[in-house]
Regions:
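Boundary regions of SH3-family modules and the immediately adjacent low-complexity/disordered segments
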Residues: 69, 143-200, 209, 221-239
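Membrane-embedded alpha-helical segments of integral membrane proteins
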Residues: 102-145
Length: 239
């Protein structure tokens, strides 16, 4: 009987371990400092939650702890696009970018204005703009048919135009083909191949704008330095 109780106790212990979700196991690995194991589970979880900013955030944390600042910045940036108001995501993205000599807030832009510009996610702003459009259409119909509500219709029209302008600028930022240097150093060459001379070297964590591609090379612009050239695809991570 005693042996039966011991066996049941052991089985219950194994059951509790296997009952943990991959996310819980990832968190446990992370707390234990097993960042590579945690990363594998977070990336597995990403397959079923591809638009979860906190999964990207946790992946970024793992890469940050492993010293891969470029890949950390790429994943923090993906999280930032989905949840721009989250303070932890914003702070960690700024920290990862600063390690590579970059800044989240462009030079000359007040931080308050930058936060206001990203106070809504792209999908939230798109939804707000669509709602304002339909409200304006409804009020405009009422004004045309009954000649009532002209003032509020004009007010909504102004708010809609402001929202539409904001959305247009966010759309340009959202669709900008960004990448980050993931390798310790990326060589910027004058053409798409190792036979072309290197004009500059860029450390990991620097932000790039992808302009074109040919074979295994991307034509890029280093945003903070204005340098243009070709870089090996394996040296960067697209965001």
């Amino acid at each position: 009987m005693k042996h039966l109780f011991i066996l049941v106790f052991i089985l219950l212990g194994f059951t509790s371990v296997f009952a943990q979700t991959p996310l819980q196991n990832a968190e446990e690995f992370y707390r234990q400092g097993k960042f590579s194991a945690a990363l594998g589970l977070y990336e597995y979880d990403l397959k079923s939650h591809p638009n979860d900013p906190y999964v990207y955030y946790n992946i970024g944390n793992c890469y940050f702890k492993m010293g891969s600042m470029g890949l950390a910045a790429a994943n923090y940036y993906r999280a930032f696009k989905l949840a721009p108001r989250n303070t932890d995501i914003r702070n960690n993205l700024s920290l990862a970018l600063s390690a590579g000599g970059e800044s989240l807030v462009p030079a000359g832009v007040p931080p308050v204005l930058h936060k206001a510009f990203f106070s809504l996610s792209y999908s939230e702003l798109k939804g707000l703009t669509m709602v304002l459009w339909w409200v304006f259409c409804l009020l405009a119909c009422i004004w045309v048919l009954k000649r009532r509500g002209g003032r509020i219709t004009a007010t909504v029209a102004v708010v809609f135009l402001l929202s539409a302008g904001w959305f247009y600028m966010r759309h340009k930022a959202e669709t900008e083909p960004l990448a980050v240097v993931a390798a310790p150093v990326a060589e910027i060459r004058s053409g798409p191949g190792t036979n072309f001379p290197a004009s500059a070297s860029v450390a990991q964590g620097h932000l790039l704008t992808v302009q074109d591609e040919k074979d295994s090379w991307y034509e890029v612009i280093v945003k903070s330095q204005g340098i243009k050239g070709w870089v090996d695809k394996n040296a960067i991570e697209q965001i």
